[in-house]
Amino acid sequence: MSVTRRSFLASAFAGSSLAFVSGGALAKAPFYGHQVLSAYRHTVGAFEVIALNDGAIEIPVAMYPKADPAEAARILEATGGAKDKIPTPVNAFLVNTGDKLVLIDSGAGKLFGPTLGRFAANLATLGVDPASVDVIAMTHLHPDHFGGLLDTQGKIAFPNAEVFVSDADLKFWLDEAIAAKVPADNKPFFDQARMVIGPYAAAKKTSVIADGKEVVPGITAMAAPGHTPGHTMYRVSSGGETLLIWGDIIHSAALQTAHPDWAIAFDTDPAMAIATRKRVFDMTATDRLTIAGAHVPFPGIGHVVKAGEAYAYAPSYWMPG
C-alpha cells in the first residue's frame, strides 16, 4: 500500500488510541515511563541557546518519493534503525541574548498527534514564563512549528511576543483563494495556519521578516525557500561565534545528507527545496558552521561534513553546564 501525506497524517493522529500493557504489578519499583532530558544548553558567544524538544514522530521512507527503497534500507539499518521508517524529532530553540528572549518556532501544540506537544511543559521546566518571551521568529508556517503559539485553551500563549514570519509564507498559507484550490489533504495546513496566526495578527503582534534583516541584534533571517515558499533560517551571531538555526533543511539526517536530492512529501516546491539544501550543505560544510535543526536528533546541534560526493551529519559533543 502506498503512503500518502493524507494516510500518514491520519495514522499519526490516530496514535492516541494505542493501548499499553503495564508490567508495573511485577516490578519492584514503578517504571518511570518517559524521558527527562528535553532541554539542552548551548552557548554562542555571549548568547545562550536552549534546544527544546517537542517530541517525535515516525515518518515512513515512502514519504520520500524519490528515495530508492533498497538504498534507504541500507542506510537506516547501518544506523541501527528500522529499514522502512525514521524516528523524526521536533525541536524548537530559545535564544537569550541577555537583552531579549527569542523563540525560534514553538513545536506542534495539539495539532500533530499525541507524541508531540511537549514544548510548553519543557519551557515551564526551565522556569520560563511565556509572558517574558519578546520575539518569536518562525522558520515557516507548518503546524509542527507554530502549534505551540496557542495554549491549551486556544488562546495566545505568548502575550507579549512579536511574531516574525516571512512575507512569502504569510501570503501563501493565509490566502483563502490558494487554500480553496489545493488538494483536500493539504487544506488542514492552511486552516491551522489561519487558526493559530490569526489571533496574533488580530492583536497586531505579527511582523514580516525579510532576508538579511535582524529580528533582534545578533539574529539575522536568511531566506531558504522550497520546503515552504518563505522558509527561513536564522543566523545567531555573538562574540565571533555563529549558530545557524536552519528549520527544515532536512527531515532525516541519515538519508538526506547522503542523498540531498531526496525531497520529502511535505515540500511545497521539491526542486527548490533540493537546490536550497545543496546550497546550505555546501555553505555549512565549507564554513564549518554549527547548525541547529528542527528535525535533527535531539538536541539537534551539530555539523555537516563532506563525505565523498555527498555529506554526513556529525552531532556536536554534549557538554555539561
Predicted feature descriptions by range:
Residues 46, 95, 105, 140, ...:
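Divalent metal-coordination and catalytic microenvironments
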Residues 54-55, 106-109, 141, 168-169, ...:
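Active-site metal-binding loops of divalent metal-dependent hydrolases
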Residues 92, 114-164:
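Active-site metal-binding motif and surrounding structural segment of the metallo-beta-lactamase
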Residues 28, 117, 124, 128, ...:
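Metallo-beta-lactamase
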